A protein has these predicted regions:
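Nucleotide-sugar donor-binding/catalytic module of glycosyltransferases
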Residues: 1-190, 194, 198
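Secondary-structure edge/capping motif, primarily at the C-terminal ends of alpha-helices
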Residues: 196-200, 223-224
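Flexible helix-coil transition and linker loops at the boundaries of alpha-helical arrays
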Residues: 198-208
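Non-catalytic, C-terminal membrane-associated alpha-helical segments of glycosyltransferases
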Residues: 209-225
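Active-site anion-handling motifs in enzyme catalytic cores
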Residues: 102, 203, 216
Length: 225
């Protein structure tokens, strides 16, 4: 806390909030409520950004007008650092194409997490998008589903901007009852299913329905958390 307070004293743009541990989702919601900037960016406590991460992502959003920027990242496992490397080139992606990519691989980091993305705060506030504090799994993905409902264009940034420290975070490693695990998975499946009904027309949804149902299995992968 003292280090953070030092940054706040040195730079008026830094706001530090001292609070009880109310969980990551509630904490993020409080941060969103206090935010005043044009964009929202999230960083997990074990991870770190490259020095130019925010500059690169904001520049991409401002130059293209995209609602979301998604960047490549580095995965850190112990002392090993490797680049994810799935983004081949900088490019603007329309919502229809982006949703198609999500359906092909919903458990991928590029869709499920917050930390390699930049969001427009105006869009978040206009639609009251918040983290679901009742969930302790896939809450990032649910936030992204809600955001993508209203976003129209997305920018893929090939430059890695984030160091993600890989830890065991799947449901198997959390102290959650089996009944609660099933309840959360079903709730997430309903949200996922409802999302695609919203963004696809009826014929397209029927053609893709089996892919949507695969989510119930894919969501158990560790890629979400």
């Amino acid at each position: 806390g003292e280090i953070c307070d030092g940054y706040a004293r040195a730079d008026a743009r830094v706001v530090v909030v001292h609070k009880e541990n109310t969980g990551v989702s509630d904490t993020r919601n409080q941060a969103i409520a206090r935010a005043r900037g044009t964009f929202l960016q999230f960083v997990d406590s074990d991870d770190w950004l490259t020095a130019d991460a925010t500059k690169l992502m904001v520049r991409a959003a401002e130059e293209t007008g995209c609602d979301m920027v998604i960047a490549d990242f580095y995965r850190v496992v112990g002392e090993m650092v490797s680049r994810k490397g799935d983004i081949d080139a900088d490019q603007v992606i329309g919502r229809e194409a982006f949703v198609g990519f999500m359906m092909e691989n919903p458990a991928d980091y590029y869709y499920g997490v917050l930390w390699n993305k930049l969001y427009r705060r105006s869009l978040v506030e206009a639609h009251g998008i918040r983290m679901d504090a009742k969930l302790s799994w896939c809450e990032d993905f649910l936030f992204n589903l809600e955001y993508v409902r209203y976003a129209t264009t997305f920018y893929a940034l090939r430059t890695p901007v984030y160091y993600y420290v890989k830890t065991k975070g799947s449901l198997v490693n959390q102290k959650i009852s089996f009944a609660r695990t099933v309840e959360m998975k079903l709730a997430m499946f309903e949200c996922y299913n409802d999302f695609f009904k919203h963004v696809l027309d009826e014929d397209a949804y029927e053609r893709k329905r089996l892919q949507v149902y695969h989510f119930l299995v894919d969501a158990a992968k560790d890629g979400f958390v």
